[in-house]
Amino acid sequence: MAKVGMRERELKREKTVAKYAEKRAALKAIIANPNVSDEERWEAQMKLQKLPRDASPSRLRNRCQVTGRPHAVLRKFRLSRIKLREAAMRGDVPGLKKASW
């Protein structure tokens, strides 16, 4: 299991990304707009650089909600493959059953 601090850090990053999402999108739109002057584009780039590092969505890592495991996490369930299998075998996940063909 991941340490509690790592899981808390990831939650903090999610909140930071959500907080700055609109501001980042607006600045990126200014930077990508070809009709904007070079000075305005430069100012937008500087403002974007001054935002917190954790405001970038690429800093997020999908983690298992139960264990905090960073690898093999299914987005739909937010569980790792191991915990998803355990939950499915217990019948905790509606509509999910073991494959048979």
Curated annotation (Swiss-Prot):
Record's subunit section: Part of the 30S ribosomal subunit. Contacts proteins S3 and S10.
The answer, when asked if Ribosomal protein is one of the entry's keywords, is yes
Q: Report the record's Gene Ontology biological process terms.
A: translation
Which PANTHER family does its entry note?
30S RIBOSOMAL PROTEIN S14, SMALL RIBOSOMAL SUBUNIT PROTEIN US14M
InterPro entries, sorted: Ribosomal_uS14 (IPR001209), Ribosomal_uS14_bac/plastid (IPR023036), Ribosomal_uS14_CS (IPR018271)
What are the disulfide bonds?
A: none
Record keyword Ribonucleoprotein present: yes
Q: What protein is this chain from?
A: Small ribosomal subunit protein uS14
Q: Look up the record and report any one GO term of the cellular component aspect.
A: cytoplasm
Q: Which family does it belong to?
A: Belongs to the universal ribosomal protein uS14 family.
- Write out the entry's keywords from A to Z: Ribonucleoprotein, Ribosomal protein, RNA-binding, rRNA-binding
Q: Please name the Pfam families in this protein's record.
A: Ribosomal_S14 (PF00253)
Task of the protein: Binds 16S rRNA, required for the assembly of 30S particles and may also be responsible for determining the conformation of the 16S rRNA at the A site.
Gene Ontology MF, one: rRNA binding
Superkingdom field: Bacteria
Q: Which organism is it from?
A: Hahella chejuensis (strain KCTC 2396)
